[in-house]
Amino acid sequence: MKQVKELIGKRVLVLGMAKSGVASALLLARIGAEVVINDSKSRADQPQAGELEAAGIQVVCGGHPLTVLDGCSLLVKNPGIPYTNIVVKEAEARGIPIWTEIELAYLISEAEMVAITGSNGKTTTTTLVKEMLEHSGRKPLIAGNIGTVASEVAQKAKAEHVIVLEVSSFQLMGTNAFQPKVAVWLNIFDAHLDYHGTREDYIAAKARIAANMGPADYLVYNADDPTVVQAIARIGATLVPFSRINVVEDGAYVKDGTIFFKDEPILALADAVLPGAHNVENMLAATAAARLAGATVEQIRHVLSHFPGVKHRLQYVGSWEGRQFYNDSKATNILATKAALSGFAKPVVLIAGGLDRGNDFDELLASLKYVKAVVAYGETKSKLLALAAKANVQAVTAERVQDATEKAVALSQPGDVVLLSPACASWDQYRSFEERGDEFLDYVNTIIKPS
């Protein structure tokens, strides 16, 4: 890894002892900084406190005394900690720079970075780029908001690697020198306004992905999103558009039902596995980014024609007796289920339900065009029955996802899609959307692959 000489001997506060905080503290100690780490939870709730102290790091738990900032030249904070936190506000008042862990990862990395952000589609696009590069003989390492701590990956990365990094607005706010070789900005929707305060601040945080890029760097951006187009107007990178609607000859686009990158035909959309207009955008963005980072057309084509989707995110599970099964357990809101349904122009048996947050499901009415039946479960099942009645769609209820899937199979015929896309959070019955999706996968796999 590269040395960061300006941090040697400097006192640095790491705020938050989640995964990225612990990784940052250990990295800073390795660099040669004097490190103190602080978390509001008690020491009894911090199993890694001993490891940190063994590395020479001062551990302060059980509150946020402002004295932890005394003598500090830098604050590295967990991305989820808001800027309204008393320690963060005090650091700002004292003029102490505030970073997140991806800034550290960038500074030490010997490998080039491909960074992907956006309100939706980050994980799918990040995974696609990683697969395209891997199949092309590059050595990609996936990291960031996708679950692998970026600074841990960056310590292991060599010059021959490429770090493919999923980054959130929370992470990007704490960057200073961060400069990926290729950046992707997928889209912008109103989100996280409780954290950022205003839509303008949220957009500005996203735009930091390209703030330091120059003409030798590439920003792949959504030319169909007017907010993104406006936000990048002063960016110094070489701009590479992608568009699902128009032909953009200097980027990635769809022409006559085929994905192109510049003048290179990549793949007919009919041969891609991922359904939905939103996934066309993800595929276009990934194609452009991977091509710019050294992937071959042949291997991009191979990945797009075989990639089943990220687990629980409109994931293609398999087929049985002419029925196709998709796991979209990550669809924890109505907007996500609308996006999933937009991807199918064949009969769908929809499995939906979960935690009742007081939502009005009438927003889904227009999206039920191809839905032949609804299997509703969980706290919202009565609301979903009412929705189905308004749409003149057959509906039944179930207790849990496995029961719902059995009933969905019984209601389906060859040529149909059986889709788990709950439109609700899982917490009425499941600890997480992953646990809910795994129950669906377990049952479907017993059908597809009987023991």
Curated annotation (Swiss-Prot):
Gene3D superfamilies: Mur ligase, C-terminal domain, Mur-like, catalytic domain, NAD(P)-binding Rossmann-like Domain. It catalyses: UDP-N-acetyl-alpha-D-muramoyl-L-alanine + D-glutamate + ATP = UDP-N-acetyl-alpha-D-muramoyl-L-alanyl-D-glutamate + ADP + phosphate + H(+). ATP binds at G118, S119, N120, G121, K122, T123, T124. It is found in: Cytoplasm. Coiled coil: none annotated. GO terms for biological process: cell division; cell wall organization; peptidoglycan biosynthetic process; regulation of cell shape. GO terms for molecular function: ATP binding; UDP-N-acetylmuramoylalanine-D-glutamate ligase activity. It comes from the Bacteria. Keywords: ATP-binding, Cell cycle, Cell division, Cell shape, Cell wall biogenesis/degradation, Cytoplasm, Ligase, Nucleotide-binding, Peptidoglycan synthesis. Its EC number is 6.3.2.9. InterPro entries: Mur-like_cat_sf, Mur_ligase_C, Mur_ligase_C_dom_sf, Mur_ligase_cen, MurD. Its main location: cytoplasm. One of its GO terms (cellular component) is cytoplasm. It holds the Pfam family MurD-like_N. Pathway: Cell wall biogenesis; peptidoglycan biosynthesis. Cell wall formation. Catalyzes the addition of glutamate to the nucleotide precursor UDP-N-acetylmuramoyl-L-alanine (UMA). Belongs to the MurCDEF family. This is UDP-N-acetylmuramoylalanine--D-glutamate ligase.
